[in-house]
């Protein structure tokens, strides 16, 4: 335990950098039960706002108290935040960014009486800690659906004579060239291709999860390069704003941007983390085991779409999305069906992915089954890292 004087000094310093919110939810017998949340940014980031909304919704539903720390970097600050939440009496603590993982693992080792849950992480299934857990959702299904909406918009533009079939090029703003992002933009592209076979896509990376200027710059570059529709896996309003300014259709992520971008927003997919939070908090309250690796799905309500902006989307988009969603739920459509894409001109019949995330990034697990790449089957976090034909990377950022 740090000496009190040092703790006070650190607190005075940290208050300028980090934000802490204590939210009392409900007034039941569980109101004294505290749940900690660690977020990389604050509500100005669409990614973090999505987590914060889910945290508050889950705690409200369960009648427990949320203690929220925002603007926590992917470094020692995460461990410090976790330790402070333990000191504050939190019995279960969640963190929301990929780079938080090693610090959450260390906290789990140091505080074995507290449950630690990390969204987007990859190591829980190999760490073997009873109180450390990973969670993700099959968001590739949501991005595939969003891609279908994008492909329908491209078809509308082709039919109207605004572009030719060969000009049906989308742009995608990514944060990093990680499997999580690769899986997302590939599923989005395959969704579009399922209805617009001539589509191609350029991808540009910013090297940051949240940098509005860089995201806007990347989207503008893609538009100037001939991309007629833009999507993204980055967390600010940079790309949607660039699209609205240029009157280029946009498929956003982590929430609707229709209010700010009414003339270009089509639809958005997102993970609803509330089902996982409710599950994990309830298990912790009841002293029940929490899955080491939990994957939410369309069926659990963890993968959702916003309302479609029918003023911008192609006619029939809502009905088409309902049809494809039903087929995804029934297993009649596989997002990564190997018949629908090639790699270097060749069909894929076998592939080993790096599922266990060792230091050497060794490919350890066969992931092609029944003619499809089985994303999220062998761990919750994405491991699709193939560069398929039709997608052109303008740069890379690791």
Q: Where are the predicted features?
A:
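Intrinsic low-complexity, intrinsically disordered segments enriched in polar/basic residues
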Residues: 3, 26-29
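Hydrophobic helical h-region of N-terminal Sec-dependent signal peptides
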Residues: 10-18
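C-terminal motif of bacterial Sec signal peptides marking the signal peptidase cleavage site
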Residues: 21-24
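Bacterial N-terminal signal peptides that target proteins for export
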Residues: 1-9
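A residue-level marker of the well-folded mature domains of exported/periplasmic proteins
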Residues: 28-398
């Amino acid at each position: 335990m740090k000496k009190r004087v040092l703790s006070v000094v650190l607190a005075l310093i940290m208050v300028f950098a980090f934000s802490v919110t204590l939210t009392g939810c409900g007034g039941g017998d569980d109101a004294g039960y505290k749940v900690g949340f660690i977020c990389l940014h604050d509500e100005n980031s669409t990614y973090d706002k999505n987590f914060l909304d889910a945290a508050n919704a889950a705690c409200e539903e369960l009648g427990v108290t949320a203690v929220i720390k925002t603007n926590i970097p992917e470094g020692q600050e995460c461990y410090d935040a976790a330790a402070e939440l333990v000191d504050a009496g939190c019995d279960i603590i969640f963190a929301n960014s990929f780079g938080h993982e090693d610090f959450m693992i260390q906290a789990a080792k140091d505080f074995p009486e507290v449950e630690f849950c990390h969204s987007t992480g990859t190591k829980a299934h190999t760490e073997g800690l009873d109180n450390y857990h990973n969670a993700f959702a099959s968001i590739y299904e949501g991005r595939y659906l969003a891609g279908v909406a994008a492909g329908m918009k491209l078809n509308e533009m082709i039919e109207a004579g605004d572009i030719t079939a060969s000009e049906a090029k989308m742009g995608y703003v990514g944060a990093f060239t990680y499997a999580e992002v690769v899986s997302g933009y590939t599923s989005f592209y395959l969704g579009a291709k399922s209805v617009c076979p001539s589509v191609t896509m350029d991808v540009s990376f910013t090297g940051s999860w949240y940098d509005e200027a860089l995201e806007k710059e990347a989207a503008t570059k893609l538009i100037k390069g001939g991309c007629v529709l833009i999507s993204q896996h980055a967390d600010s309003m940079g790309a949607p704003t660039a699209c609205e300014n240029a009157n280029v259709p946009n498929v956003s992520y982590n929430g609707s941007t229709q209010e700010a971008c009414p003339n270009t927003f089509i639809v958005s997919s997102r993970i609803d983390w509330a089902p996982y939070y409710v599950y994990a908090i309830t298990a912790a309250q009841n002293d029940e085991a929490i899955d080491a690796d939990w994957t939410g799905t369309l069926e659990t309500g963890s993968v959702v779409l916003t309302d479609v902006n029918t003023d911008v989307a192609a006619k029939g988009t809502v009905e088409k999305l309902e049809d494809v969603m039903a087929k995804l739920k029934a297993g009649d459509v596989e997002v990564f069906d190997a018949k629908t894409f090639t790699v270097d001109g060749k069909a894929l019949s076998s592939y080993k992915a790096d599922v266990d995330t060792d230091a050497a990034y060794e490919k350890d697990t066969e992931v092609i089954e029944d003619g499809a790449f089985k994303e999220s089957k062998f761990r919750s976090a994405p491991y699709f890292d193939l560069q398929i034909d039709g997608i052109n990377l303008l740069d890379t950022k690791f």
